[in-house]
């Protein structure tokens, strides 16, 4: 065990959560700045139409991957924490073996499907044969995306420092690459290549670091013991949990990808680029929401299992801090968004101001809901959380189609804000009606 793990275990639960979150947010803060600069340089170099085309290429690959992503990271944490706390390396090793197998199979399947479907999906989004070739080439990076188990291993052993560094890799590559591409007035294929290399590299780094951690803590303890026969059925409830987190992950990600491609289909690549730009800027809040879930889930699971009152403290205080931070960004966008977009990106992107404000509001609501969702998972109510997000996603997609058709891009932002409030309200009611002594675990 390293010094990082020793020192974190000595902290009270809330301080440990904040310490781990700070480790990640330092990396994410630098990454967010570089990602924004890279996006801004690409937008300035290519213009709205070709910028939107790169966005559609990336979104297509992410959409296909999301369809086959079983989000094994949460399974490793949910079922790995008890084994880790009891130093049961055999059970932990078998769990990781099962989850790794799922990662490998799903990433290979996603790559094959993306390559097969690309010639048909590309033209429907306004792509010519050249763009379709770029779309197929970009799809190959999906082979590197089976990283759920790797992320779970690093979270299990409190290596949030590694996760923090990993988050800076893709933005750094894109930042450096975009500077050179902007300086040389590069073509669209150069930017597609930069984005693909960055995306693959960050995944390969995580796989490498998790392998080192696995070899140190688990493989050595399993010397002479075979785990090749590990099966999904060895873990009670794991199959159900994976299906729940699969659908939950899709409910989080797929609507965003679907709506981006729908805007490209209905309004054109330029408008799809503006929507993606607003999402990229609102990721200043949506990405911390993901980080909070990564950091907080381990401690919430442990405190719920132990029946500690720290469970409520961690969940509610983190939600309040997230809400206060998010509102600052919403107000900044409302009052200064037009000036900032015009200065940083150019006047042709000022039209994204209104949708940006709504997307930041939706991201703020998601930021508040993020620790509550981890609490729901820790309590054993993952299926109930998923049902809330099914309702939210249904509302979002219906409102998106209706409001975008009538109001344009601003309708997409309004739909996102209304839908984001649904799971927040539902999870608050669910948590308030349950106490640690009623744990389902």
Regions found by a protein language model. Give the residues of each.
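Interhelical loop/hinge segments that connect adjacent transmembrane helices in multipass membrane
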Residues: 2-17, 188, 192, 206-256, ...
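Signature of the first transmembrane helix
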Residues: 15-77, 111, 115, 243-270, ...
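Membrane-water interface segments that mark the loop-to-transmembrane alpha-helix transition
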Residues: 19-35, 57, 66-119, 128, ...
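Interfacial/gating helices of multi-pass transporter permease domains
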Residues: 39-63, 131, 188-193, 233-245, ...
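Helix-loop junctions and terminal segments of transmembrane helices
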Residues: 69-86, 155-156, 278-306, 375-378
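Interfacial segments at transmembrane-helix termini and the short loops linking adjacent helices
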Residues: 118-137, 334-364
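Hydrophobic alpha-helical transmembrane segments
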Residues: 131-136, 164-221, 392-395, 409-433
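Membrane-interface junctions at transmembrane-helix termini in multi-pass inner-membrane proteins
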Residues: 142-168, 361-390
